[in-house]
Amino acid sequence: MTEQHSGFPRRDAEGRIRTLGDLLGVSLAGLVIGVLAVVLFDFAFASFGAGEFGQANGWLAVILPAWLYWEDFRAWEFGAARVVAALAAGAAGVTAGLVAAGLAAGLPPLLSGGLGAAGFTLAYAVVWFPGVRWLARRTG
């Protein structure tokens, strides 16, 4: 198996992310960028009088990590392993995100949604990465 040496995250010849650390690092960086973008837009709208600051939906911060996960999903060959792993990771991610957002329910939507997005991002990566590899080995 040859490796592609063009940047970060490191990918194998099929375009799959090689390590869990790379997946977590890039997805968390995407989450931070997403949170900063939502904060910037929320601040801009609040300064124009279009609502109070902190009322934007922090769940929007999950867009970049979800895009990364979609690209990694597409890099795996067609089969049940990637679908089952994605469904399990999605269920774990949504559950972790909703629990995190629920525990922070008294906070503004920007913060509680951001915490929910962080819970989703972490849980999805931790379930997807080993899950798809294990299932791909099991199904051949």
Regions of interest found by a model, annotated:
Residues 1, 60-67, 120-128:
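Hydrophobic cores of alpha-helical transmembrane segments in multi-pass inner/ER membrane proteins
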Residues 1-47:
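N-terminal signal-anchor transmembrane alpha-helix
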Residues 20, 36-39, 102-140:
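Alpha-helical membrane-associated segments of multi-pass integral membrane proteins
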Residues 24, 57, 79-86:
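Membrane-interfacial loop-to-transmembrane alpha-helix junctions, especially the N-terminal start
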Residues 49, 55, 66-72, 100-102:
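The transition from N-terminal targeting/processing segments to the mature protein
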Residues 59-79:
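Canonical alpha-helical transmembrane segments
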Residues 81-99:
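Transmembrane alpha-helical segments of multi-pass membrane proteins
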